[in-house]
Amino acid sequence: MGQRRIGQASLAEALLPAGAGSNRRLERIAGLIDWSPFERLLAPLRAPTGRPGYPPLALFRALLLAQWYQLSDPGLEEALADRLSFRRFCGFGLDDGTPDETTLCRFRAVLAERGLAERLFNELNRQLDERGLVLKAGTLIDATLVEAAVARPPVSEGEVSTKDPDAGFTRRGQRSFFGFKAHLAVDLGSDLVRGAVLTGADVGDSLAADGLVQGDEAAVFMDKAYDSATRREALAAAGIVDGIMHRGHARRRLAAWQRWMNVALAPIRSQVERAFGTLKRSYGWRRVRYRGLLRNGAHLQLLCIALNLRRAARLAA
C-alpha cells in the first residue's frame, strides 16, 4: 500500500490569511539542507503492504520538533494537530490527519533498533561540512553525566539495576551517581557536535575519547582526565596538535611550563560546556527518558541533530 500522500493543496489552505502559521526559525531550518538523502535513509521504514503509513521523513521531522520544544509523545500529537507551523514543517496540509502518540513512539523505537539515528546524524554533518560550516580548527572532547530514567537500585540489588542494567554507578564529587555518560566531540568555533557516544556512567571518560577524534581537525582539546602518553603519541602521529591538559601526580608535580599550558588551554577546552548546557537546559536532558543504551543512545543522536540544525541555521544566517 505504500505511504499516505500529504501536503496536498486544499481550499482551507487557500483561505488562510497571509502569514498565518509563520515560524521563521522552522522555515530557515526546513530550507537549510537537502532532505532527500534523509528520505532515502528512512525509505526502508515504509510498510510495503497494509494500510498506508505516514511518510517517514514527516515523522522524523516531528521528532525534531519534540526535541526543540521539549514535547512528550502526547504533547507532540496534540501540537501537530493544533499548530499550523508544526504541520508545515512536517509537510502536513490542513486537511491531513496527523500521527498519534503510539505511531510516534513506534517510529522512534524503530530508528533506534535499526541504527538509523546515527546514520541521519552523520548525513547532516556531511552536508554541514560541505557548506563550510564545520571549521575543523579543533575538536573539543569531554563527557557529562545524565541521570537514569529509573530510580537507583536498592542496596539489596547490588551495583546492577534490574530495571535498567545498562545504567551504571560512578562518583560525582563526594556523591554517588547512577545513570549514563554522554561523550561529545564539538567543533571549535562553530559549536557543532561532530560525534556523540553514550555509555553507562561507570565507563571512564578516557575510554570513549579516541573514537571521537575526527582525524581531519587541526587540534584536539581535552581536560586532564584524558592525559596519557599513548594518546599524545597517537595525535602526534596523525599530525594533530595536542591540546590535552596535563595531569600531575603525587610523586611528580607539574613543571612550570605544564602549569602554564593548562592555564592557556582551560578557556579553550571549557567551550565544550556550551553544548552540554544546551542539551540539559534547552532540551531538558538532565535525565534520560528511556531505559537502556539502545534507545537512549539513539535519542542522544537525535538531540545532536536538533542541536546542530538550530546552530547551523544561526551560522548560515
What are these regions (language model features)?
Residues 301-310, 314-317:
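C-terminal domain-tail junction helix/linker
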Residues 218-219, 224-298:
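Helix-centered, glycine/charged polyanion-binding patches within enzymatic domains
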Residues 1-35, 39, 312-317:
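Charged, often Cys/His-bearing segments associated with DNA-binding zinc-finger transcription factors
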Residues 78-81, 90-95, 99-241, 245-247, ...:
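Polybasic low-complexity intrinsically disordered regions
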Residues 34, 51-57, 96-99, 297-301, ...:
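Secondary-structure capping and boundary motifs in well-ordered enzyme cores
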Residues 19-69:
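Basic, short loop/linker segments at the boundary and entry of helix-turn-helix/winged-helix-like folds
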